[in-house]
């Protein structure tokens, strides 16, 4: 036996039924669609839900786009920094070790909610203006790192 002599087993392959090819063919006249009605005539259009308000109308239009270059910061408020039991320079690695930011390597931004009662020496990727003012007013230092 050679490769070109291979054939499927007898009875394992049936020819496709050709509908609408005369009454004698067994699937003539209505071609298995029954009589009358929307589904007997043509196709129901894509997205049609039987008269119910379809999903694409219920959701409304989505506008705009997602900026693939958007920088998403891990944020920490100065009030949390003030509570840290740490005296050295506060860096993103220090914040990760205290579990104030996640371990995902995202840049860290310091925001200005809370009070600063002691001089803080902070290094971060970004600062809000209110956070910068509060840290400097308490005698601390602010350094933007890249």
UniProtKB/Swiss-Prot annotation:
Residues covered by region (Disordered): 1-51
Cysteines engaged in disulfide bonds, as pairs: none
Biased composition (Gly residues): 23-35
One GO process term, biological-process aspect: translation
Gene3D superfamilies: 3.100.10.10
GO cellular component, one term: cytosolic large ribosomal subunit
Stored InterPro entries: Ribosomal_uL15, Ribosomal_uL15/eL18, Ribosomal_uL15/eL18_sf, Ribosomal_uL15_bac-type, Ribosomal_uL15_CS
Annotated keywords: Ribonucleoprotein, Ribosomal protein, RNA-binding, rRNA-binding
One GO MF term: structural constituent of ribosome
Subunit structure: Part of the 50S ribosomal subunit.
Record-linked NCBIfam families: rplO_bact
Entry function: Binds to the 23S rRNA.
Annotated family: Belongs to the universal ribosomal protein uL15 family.
Cited PANTHER family: 50S RIBOSOMAL PROTEIN L15, LARGE RIBOSOMAL SUBUNIT PROTEIN UL15M
Name of this chain's protein: Large ribosomal subunit protein uL15
Species, as recorded: Thermomicrobium roseum (strain ATCC 27502 / DSM 5159 / P-2)
Name of the coding gene: rplO
